[in-house]
From Swiss-Prot:
UniProt protein name: DNA mismatch repair protein MutS
Nucleotide-binding as UniProt keyword: yes
Gene3D superfamilies xref list: 1.10.1420.10, 6.10.140.430, DNA repair protein MutS, domain I, MutS, connector domain, P-loop containing nucleotide triphosphate hydrolases
GO-annotated biological processes: mismatch repair
Gene Ontology molecular functions: ATP binding; ATP-dependent DNA damage sensor activity; damaged DNA binding; mismatched DNA binding
Record-listed ATP binding positions: G629, P630, N631, M632, G633, G634, K635, S636
Keywords, ordered alphabetically: ATP-binding, DNA damage, DNA repair, DNA-binding, Nucleotide-binding
Role summary: This protein is involved in the repair of mismatches in DNA. It is possible that it carries out the mismatch recognition step. This protein has a weak ATPase activity.
UniProt lineage: Bacteria, Pseudomonadati, Pseudomonadota, Betaproteobacteria, Burkholderiales
Gene source species: Ralstonia nicotianae (strain ATCC BAA-1114 / GMI1000) (Ralstonia solanacearum)
GO cellular component, one term: cytosol
Family statement drawn from the similarity comment of this UniProt entry: Belongs to the DNA mismatch repair MutS family.
Length: 882
């Protein structure tokens, strides 16, 4: 991703002597010096122009034309441009590439300015500070995050402070964590842009757009002061962050940077949430990836848990649902309140509620743009129409003494009468897209604007009336009153009627066959009419800006309404999903353990015709399940579905199971699948061991641990020894709820040593030379792994399968004779004479006469007689070979 540094304040020497440049280029270079690592979009008329190296870079990234025009300092001016009315599409492309763009507008009046029109950078568009609807994903929050590190006291590890902001939503959050936890938190938050000093950014592995700031931006005292100013308080004690020094340092840098990019204060950032690791069920990077919450293992958006659940009626709901899935809560009270609300919704008319919600606009983002004074006319009309429908939403929210959450939402959705009335009076029913086009402010809102519009709109009728009066007054029947852009309004009289022209006519233009005149009355009207449209647009722009200011005091209530609508949408969506997918309400209890009855994998179930539901019981006397069975038998699916049911329960959703009783959970760990990290210089086995080590260090008795085929990637004895030791450690030290899938059948002896371990297996049956997977979890260990049958299904050549069968038979016989599994040298010759056939089978063999004859037969082209003859020939060849 692109990196940016803090602005410098001096002209780059590469541009040569400053006084050798033209006045306009001097203006540009001053602006560019404040944004040296940012593309500068310099407004010139209907285009944003880029110059010098910015032009070259933009031409390459945007595939636009690079040209030269004029000279400055004796050199051609390299330039490229984009039309201002289509700038959003170019900004979107640049931001996706990790670039930042400074938008430089004309703020002076060309009519009264000598030299270059005054310009200034009005905002800086960076990956983390997007506010335009065209640049934002509807269903993903866009976060700007700052990281600050404070040295630990007395040799302790440094404190890492995080502050992150959803700029358009106005949500500010803080937390502190350890350095080793940083990447996990970045994976959870997934910011679009990170701010930090050099040393901190160099230690960040997360792939993200980065902006480097000097160390002094991350000052604790300055950060605390900036945060108090932002929140309008004298103390931060009430927010619980006064002692979070590293987080305060990060917050100060974050708020200053965000305000600088917008060129104004952040009026809508009026609250603060302090997060603690203990609030949420811990999900590390591997777990989020393996459970495919919002992205598949291949990096696709579907099929995932989010894509299955997201039938939300609003974009606000989709964003909140995504947040909930990544933040399951440890405290049972909140998910239980959500589940109770879902139950009440299911008993009512949730379909009508969802229908109404679909008609609403994105109040959260409109409110953010309103706070930044960048809301467009249709934002305001959408906001007005949404506020008008709040009573309908409230009526459709069922009220119950058993669902306090729904009551809270009902109260939060009271219509703000003053704001709604103001929008109704001020904004047209269907306003123009941009205020510069006019047609935004409603008639009757401002008398001066109405008068100017009347002049402009009644211009045609005035000219018709004037023409009729002048014909009658002068007796010139073919007199015409007209207008053109060069000469304005005029009265045209043919040369043959010139003698009838009154004295008050003043000649304006002479043509070959006619004269054009102006009268005092027409001149007065011309002055008024020609300026009326410009004055109306100017007046409308002023009124619109004033309207935005008048709406600012309503920001807190609008933010509350946005949050309530999003939550109502998610709850109604989860109710719809529970109904459509036949999910049930889980029971969250104090007693440790997990008991799932006929549980299903929520996503896989939708991808197959028939899904086999399974039970899963983990309790104090049954902490670890050793899962054996064939590849493709469903072990990984069984493990993942258990984790997803637990996660959904603590999100507050219903779950894909007939019944679920789940005790306290603090973390979910997964060690599933095989993948290397070539960029990081780590093999598949190293990645596996690194993830296993993290689990062994961090898992607690309330953690859910999924371990899939641990120990592969090394020799048989090494892998088996590691798998045995890891399973024992999880039982004796971590005591976590553990699902441990393995192909090491020796591990099935573990329950003999630990009473809290139990064997289960995924069943399969052989059918002829093939295998049928039953996908049913049954008690006890599997009888075999069916590896050869799976290899055959995969299309492994038959000679290889035959050789493997013989080798397997010898290995099993050797194991039975010695009571041990041999540590094999795969490159050694067979040590048993009976295995010569296996070695022979593995080598290429000359085709037999019978095989050659079979290869030469084309059954589709044979007559019945030909087929009978061929059968006799094959029988003869078979007898001869025998």
């Amino acid at each position: 991703m692109a990196e940016h540094s803090a602005p410098a304040l001096e002209i780059d020497p590469k541009y040569g002597p400053f006084d050798k440049h033209t006045p306009m280029m001097q203006q540009y270079l001053k602006l560019k010096s404040a944004h040296p690592h940012t593309l500068v979009f310099y407004r010139m008329g209907d285009f944003y122009e880029l110059f010098f190296e910015d032009a070259e870079k933009a031409a390459r990234l945007l595939d636009i034309t690079l040209t030269s025009r004029g000279t400055t300092n004796g050199q051609p001016i390299r330039m490229a441009g984009v039309p201002f009315h289509a700038v959003e599409q170019y900004l979107a492309k640049l931001v996706k590439l990790g670039e930042s763009v400074a938008i430089c507008e004309q703020i002076g009046d060309p009519a009264t300015t000598k030299g270059p029109v005054e310009r200034k950078v009005v905002r800086v568009v960076t990956p983390g500070t997007l506010t335009d609807a065209a640049l934002l994903s509807d269903k993903v929050n866009n976060h700007l995050l700052a990281i600050a590190q404070i040295p630990g006291k007395r040799g302790a590890a440094p404190l890492v402070g995080l502050a992150w902001l959803n700029l358009v939503g106005g949500e500010l959050r803080l937390m502190e964590c350890s350095a080793e936890q940083l990447d996990r938190e970045l994976e959870r938050i997934r910011p679009a842009e990170v701010l930090a000093d050099d040393a901190t950014l160099n230690a960040v592995a997360f792939d993200v757009a980065r902006t480097r700031l000097p160390d002094w931006h991350f000052d604790v005292e300055a950060g605390a002061r900036r945060l108090r100013e932002q929140l309008g308080v004298a103390s931060l004690v009430a927010f619980g962050c006064e002692t979070l020094t590293a987080a305060l340092a990060a917050a100060g840098a974050l708020l200053n940077y965000a305000a600088a990019t917008q060129g104004q204060s952040l009026r809508h950032v009026i609250g603060l949430t302090v997060e603690h690791e203990s609030e949420f069920i811990g999900l590390d990077t591997a777990t989020r990836r393996n459970l495919e919450l919002t992205e598949t293992l291949r990096g696709q958006e579907s099929p995932t848990l989010f894509s299955l659940l997201d039938t939300c009626a609003t974009s606000m709901g989709s964003r909140l649902l995504r947040h909930w899935l990544h933040h399951p809560l440890r405290d049972r009270a909140v998910p239980q309140a959500r589940q109770q609300a879902i139950e009440v919704l299911l008993a009512g008319d949730w379909q009508s509620l969802r229908g109404t919600l679909r008609t609403l606009s994105d109040v959260e983002r409109i409110t953010g743009r309103l706070a930044l004074l960048s809301a467009r006319p249709r934002d305001l009309s959408s906001l007005r129409d949404t506020l008008a429908r709040l009573p309908e939403v409230r009526d459709q929210l069922p009220q119950s003494d058993d669902a306090q959450l729904l009551g809270d939402l009902h109260a939060a959705l009271a219509i703000p009468e003053d704001a709604h009335a103001l929008l109704q009076r001020a904004v047209m029913a269907e306003p123009a897209a941009m205020v510069r086009d006019g047609g935004v402010i409603a008639r009757g809102y401002d008398a001066d604007l109405d008068e100017l519009r009347d002049i402009s709109e009644n211009c045609g009728q005035f000219l018709v009336d004037l023409e009729a009066r002048e014909r009658e007054r002068t007796g010139i029947a073919n007199l015409r009153v007209e207008y053109n852009r060069v000469h304005g309004f005029y009265i045209e009289v043919t040369n043959g009627q010139a003698a009838k022209v009154p004295d008050d006519y003043r000649r304006r233009q002479t043509l070959k066959n006619a004269e054009r005149y102006i009268t005092p009355e027409l001149k007065a009207f011309e002055d008024k009419a020609l300026s009326a449209q410009d004055r109306a647009l100017s007046r409308e722009k002023y009124l619109y800006e004033d309207l935005l200011q008048k709406l600012l005091p309503h920001l807190p209530v609008l933010k509350r309404i946005a949050a309530a609508l999003a939550q109502a949408d998610v709850l109604a969506t989860l109710a719809e999903r529970a109904h459509a997918l036949s999910w049930s309400r889980p029971a969250l209890t104090d007693a440790p353990g997990i008991e799932l009855i006929r549980a299903r994998h929520p996503v896989v179930e939708q991808q197959v015709e028939q899904f086999v539901a399974n039970d899963c019981v983990l309790q104090e006397t049954r902490k670890l399940l050793l899962i054996t069975g064939p590849n493709m038998g469903g072990k990984s699916t069984f493990m993942r579905q258990t984790a997803l049911v637990v996660l959904l329960a603590y999100v507050g959703a219903f779950v894909p199971a007939d019944a679920a009783t789940i005790g306290p959970i603090d973390r979910i760990f997964t060690r599933i699948g095989a993948a290397d990290d070539l960029a990081g210089g780590r093999s598949t086995f190293m990645v596996e061991m690194t993830e296993a080590a993290a689990i062994l260090h961090r898992a607690t008795p309330n953690s859910l641990v999924l371990m899939d085929e641990i120990g592969r990637g090394t020799s048989t004895f090494d892998g088996l020894a590691l798998a045995w030791a890891i399973a024992r450690h999880l039982l004796s030290h971590n005591r976590s709820h553990t699902l441990f899938a393995t192909h090491y059948f020796e591990l099935t002896q573990l329950p003999q040593e630990f009473a809290q371990a139990a064997n289960v297996h995924l069943s399969a049956v052989e059918h002829g030379d093939g295998i049928v997977f039953l996908h049913a979890v049954q008690e006890g260990p599997a009888s075999q792994s069916y590896g050869l049958q799976v290899a055959q299904l995969a299309g492994v050549p038959q000679p290889v399968i035959r050789a493997a069968r013989k080798r397997l038979a010898w290995l099993e016989q050797h194991s039975a004779d010695t009571g041990a599994t041999p540590q094999l040298d795969l490159f050694a010759l067979p040590s048993d004479p009976s295995d010569d056939d296996a070695a022979e089978a593995a080598a290429p063999a000359a085709p037999s006469a019978l095989a050659e004859a079979l290869d030469g037969i084309d059954p589709d082209s044979m007559t019945p007689r030909d087929a009978l003859d061929a059968l006799y020939r094959l029988k003869a060849l078979s007898d001869a070979s025998a």
